[in-house]
């Protein structure tokens, strides 16, 4: 009888310990932050920026006609960076797959998302939709490995013009036709411009998403090059207010290019979900500072990048 009682008490101890662990994990109300390494366009740069603490990377995709051909930015670019690093797009995607596929020798558990900055400004109107179709085909074949143990990271498609919503429609249609509509759960969207003559209003951006057939998985970016003055962050604050409103359509907001400690702290204080930076180690340092480590943490794969975390 005593042995039986001891076994029962022992089992309850294990259960309670497990419950305490679960509660502790759920009780972590710190804002998860995506640490986006800026302008990672050569495969040799991938481990370098991951080693600096990035949990996400951004690459620039340039086109020949409607075909995504290179990861390349070109001049001018952020101060202190090599603007002409590049790789063939298919090779870059295959390499990303290696770093984000469990079991691969290069796998990095902390690498959870990448942003494709799609340079569609060079495209004619009739090339926009085919470009979206071609990017979907490249991702399906070279990153997702046609659905057979491909990379697990989330993908954000960043378009520089709200008028290019047909890109998204073409992208989605390819995955549906190929029988991989499920992969759209891994895809988010960011309409970031155009910048000239002025940035579109949030209402205009929302309308573009409706035309693209997108409801959810929405990221919004705001910022300037790292050599520009900080300014008052008026648009950023407006976007965060919209995100946190009852009828907000934005899920995540990131700010670029944030390289200074002071600007990093300011962006976090305002309420961003992500910071795009040339120095991921700066954000890591700030996240470990008093006043920040209790309110923010580096996002992990278990954090849903399409979930809205209000301020």
UniProtKB/Swiss-Prot annotation:
The keyword Repeat does not apply. Mg(2+) binds at residues 58, 60, 117. It comes from the Eukaryota. Its main location: secreted. It catalyses: an N-(acyl)-sphingosylphosphocholine = an N-(acyl)-sphingosyl-1,3-cyclic phosphate + choline; an N-(acyl)-sphingosylphosphoethanolamine = an N-(acyl)-sphingosyl-1,3-cyclic phosphate + ethanolamine; a 1-acyl-sn-glycero-3-phosphocholine = a 1-acyl-sn-glycero-2,3-cyclic phosphate + choline; a 1-acyl-sn-glycero-3-phosphoethanolamine = a 1-acyl-sn-glycero-2,3-cyclic phosphate + ethanolamine. Residues 1-21 form the signal peptide. Keywords: Cytolysis, Dermonecrotic toxin, Disulfide bond, Hemolysis, Lipid degradation, Lipid metabolism, Lyase, Magnesium, Metal-binding, Secreted, Signal, Toxin, Zymogen. The active site is at 38, 73 (nucleophile). Expressed by the venom gland. Its EC number is 4.6.1.-. Changing residue 262 to A: Decrease in catalytic and hemolytic activities. Gene3D superfamilies: Phosphatidylinositol (PI) phosphodiesterase. GO terms for molecular function: lyase activity; metal ion binding; phosphoric diester hydrolase activity; toxin activity. It is found in: Secreted. Its cofactor is Mg(2+). Dermonecrotic toxins cleave the phosphodiester linkage between the phosphate and headgroup of certain phospholipids (sphingolipid and lysolipid substrates), forming an alcohol (often choline) and a cyclic phosphate. This toxin acts on sphingomyelin (SM). It may also act on ceramide phosphoethanolamine (CPE), lysophosphatidylcholine (LPC) and lysophosphatidylethanolamine (LPE), but not on lysophosphatidylserine (LPS), and lysophosphatidylglycerol (LPG). It acts by transphosphatidylation, releasing exclusively cyclic phosphate products as second products. Shows complement-dependent hemolysis. This is Dermonecrotic toxin.
């Amino acid at each position: 009888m005593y042995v039986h009682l001891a076994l029962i008490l022992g089992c309850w101890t294990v259960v309670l310990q497990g419950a305490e662990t679960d509660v502790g994990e759920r009780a972590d109300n710190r804002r998860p932050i995506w640490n986006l390494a800026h302008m990672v366009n050569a495969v040799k740069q991938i481990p370098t920026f991951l080693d600096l603490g990035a949990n996400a990377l951004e690459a620039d995709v340039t086109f020949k006609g409607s075909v995504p051909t290179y990861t390349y930015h070109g001049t001018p670019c952020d101060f202190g960076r090599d603007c002409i690093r590049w790789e063939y797009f298919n090779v870059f995607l295959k390499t990303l797959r290696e770093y984000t596929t469990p079991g691969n020798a290069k796998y990095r558990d902390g690498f959870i998302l990448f942003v494709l900055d799609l340079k569609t400004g060079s495209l004619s109107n009739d090339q926009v939709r085919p470009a979206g179709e071609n990017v979907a085909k490249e991702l399906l074949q070279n990153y997702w490995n046609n659905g057979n143990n491909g990379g697990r990271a989330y993908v954000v498609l960043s378009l520089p013009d709200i008028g290019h919503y047909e890109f998204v429609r073409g992208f989605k249609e390819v995955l549906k036709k190929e029988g991989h509509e499920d992969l759209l759960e891994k895809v988010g969207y960011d309409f970031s411009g155009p910048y000239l003559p002025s940035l579109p209003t949030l209402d205009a951006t929302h309308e573009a998403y409706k035309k693209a057939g997108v409801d959810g998985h929405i990221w919004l970016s705001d910022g300037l090059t790292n050599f520009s003055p900080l300014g008052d962050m008026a648009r950023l604050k407006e976007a965060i207010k919209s995100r946190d409103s009852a009828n907000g359509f934005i899920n995540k907001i990131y700010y670029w290019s944030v390289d200074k400690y002071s600007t990093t702290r300011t962006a976090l204080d305002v309420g961003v979900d992500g910071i795009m930076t040339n120095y991921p180690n700066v954000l890591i340092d700030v996240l470990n500072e008093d006043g920040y480590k209790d309110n923010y943490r580096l996002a992990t794969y278990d954090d849903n990048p399409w979930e809205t975390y209000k301020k």
